[in-house]
Amino acid sequence: RAAFGRRAEVLARNLDAVHQEQETAVLSEARRWLDVYFGGQEPDFTPPLHPAGSAFQQEVWALLRRIPCGQTTTYGALAKQLAAERGLSRMSAQAVGGAVGHNVISIIIPCHRVVGANGSLTGYAGGIDKKAALLRLEMKMTR
């Protein structure tokens, strides 16, 4: 939740309008999802998320949501999958990585499940140590 807190602080500092905190159905569902997840269980529901992003980013984020809990994939594999779905011969893993990096709903849209081509843990907004911890938590969930 710390990563969400930092992002909320950045948003609050950059808002021109008055910021008012209130509980909404989406926030309530996201909180419930996170409570289940950090309680060590794989949530059996997805909050009704509507992240803002380009059509390409939306496609990549949809792929991220299809990566099973406790498993990882590579940027290259995501690029191949998206290229196949679009009927293209290939797609840039770097472009996919850029879209993954713009995911602002980390954990629920599981960008932490994407690793480098050699299986190494690569960039994560919350830090590599947090990415490793999330993957360990998921391994325990799926045993």
Locations of the language-model features?
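Compact structured core domains
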Residues: R1-T46
